[in-house]
């Protein structure tokens, strides 16, 4: 007997490839199924090797693909094999489906077989789309946005499903991490479904006798497939949890301390002083330490940027019912984790101290947090002092004041163009206000060389407005020349402000308005 027939392993290959009995009416169209299997193996193998070098991080995805093409040995061959293999996979699949339609493979008794093939086809389309999203760029970004927005057509829960798929209100890191993970799982699911497909073919084409032994064999095989599926989905859950953890932590330097040299943290400090809070509240007999910022819903993108920069906290939406019955939507970013507060927030505010009287709140907050005060009864009485923490000169001498000021403007400033009554020409206006912060307002006035007076109302809210040509010029030049830029809705307001400013002769003739920001 030939060795290929006597060997336990080779005999299996021999029975299916060499000595496999086939009907005389079979033709070359029946090669499509085996070619599909070959294409799938090529896709899985090349995909595994490329995944070793690919990063699903939103900032590294495109660079990692470039790394595969340029730095990985024969990486370009892997990528081209993967890309062209996908094209051939679909070409062969469509020919395979056309053969099935032509020969009536969808009719009884092969209905189940055809349905399994349809499921494989749908899974393949989904897998191809996920791979299309992995290279983070404009095309994949908007392609993913459009396709996933299809779920918004589902009544009642559509928008929630879209937000869940995105991992937030825009394309966040978890979305692209999940794309990569889901793609790998779907590849294995296609492989498993193809095994089912093959088993059903055996049942139909070889006229298997449904005796007790064969039923046991089929039962065992399907249980094995169920175990494989369960393993893959458990692996997916673990990977998604790990991905969520990695996307909600921040990178430390070698000494495990936050690197606060980036002036963007001064910007965040100014933003918190404008619209943020830092509190110790009672939760039963325990204390809840919290730092947060609340803004209008239009600034939700800004809060997500802050979350991504810090790597901690969460963003939520809440609806407020106004006195007139209308609903106002607000978004909130807050941090409650003590380790995050100690290791990230405190180093930032130690490096860039608050300039308003909120610094008293911070010192009280920091003292209790570092002492690990847990119970409400152990908390000492606190009342914010009235005396200013910093003088105007102290504020102006801070080397981070310009970066801090951009963040403060993001929260508390307003750019507007309006037409006064009985006047033909429009007027530009810049306004900034804050409660219990006269020294900060005086520092801003001095720093920007604004001549207008500061108005303080009976609630101790200080407001400064400038409409003069020189004042508007100083504000525009400061914002445009600052290395730290506006990041939220205020940026859009400022861009529209510049656009309208170019149409006002008295400003346009006096100084050169920046063409872009």
Swiss-Prot record:
One of its GO terms (cellular component) is mitochondrial inner membrane. GO terms for molecular function: electron transfer activity; endonuclease activity; oxidoreductase activity; RNA binding. Residues 1-31, 106-115, 167-184, 243-517 are mitochondrial matrix. Changing residue 437 to N: In strain: 777-3A. Changing residue 434 to M: In strain: 777-3A. GO terms for biological process: Group I intron splicing; mitochondrial electron transport, ubiquinol to cytochrome c; mitochondrial mRNA processing; mRNA processing. InterPro entries: Cyt_b/b6_N (IPR005797), Cytb/b6-like_sf (IPR027387), Cytochrome_b_N_euk/bac (IPR048259), Di-haem_cyt_TM (IPR016174), Homing_endonucl (IPR027434), LAGLIDADG_dom (IPR004860). Residues 53-84, 137-145, 206-224 are mitochondrial intermembrane. Changing residue 350 to N: In strain: 777-3A. Keywords: Membrane, Mitochondrion, Mitochondrion inner membrane, mRNA processing, mRNA splicing, RNA-binding, Transmembrane, Transmembrane helix. The chain crosses the membrane at residues 32-52, 85-105, 116-136, 146-166, 185-205, 225-242. It is a multi-pass membrane protein. Residues 1-169 are annotated as: Cytochrome b. Residues 170-517 are annotated as: Maturase. It comes from the Eukaryota. It is found in: Mitochondrion inner membrane. SUPFAM superfamilies: Homing endonucleases (SSF55608), Transmembrane di-heme cytochromes (SSF81342). Changing residue 407 to D: In G5037; blocks formation of mature cytochrome b mRNA. Forms a ribonucleoprotein complex composed of maturase bI3 and 2 dimers of MRS1 that assemble around the bI3 RNA. In the N-terminal section; belongs to the cytochrome b family. In the C-terminal section; belongs to the LAGLIDADG endonuclease family. Mitochondrial mRNA maturase required for splicing of intron 3 of the cytochrome b (COB) gene, containing its own coding sequence. In vivo splicing requires the formation of a ribonucleoprotein complex together with the imported mitochondrial RNA-splicing protein MRS1. The complex seems to stimulate the intrinsic ribozyme activity of intron bI3 through binding to and stabilizing specific secondary and tertiary structure elements in the RNA. This is Cytochrome b mRNA maturase bI3. It comes from Saccharomyces cerevisiae (strain ATCC 204508 / S288c). The lineage of its organism: Eukaryota, Fungi, Dikarya, Ascomycota, Saccharomycotina.
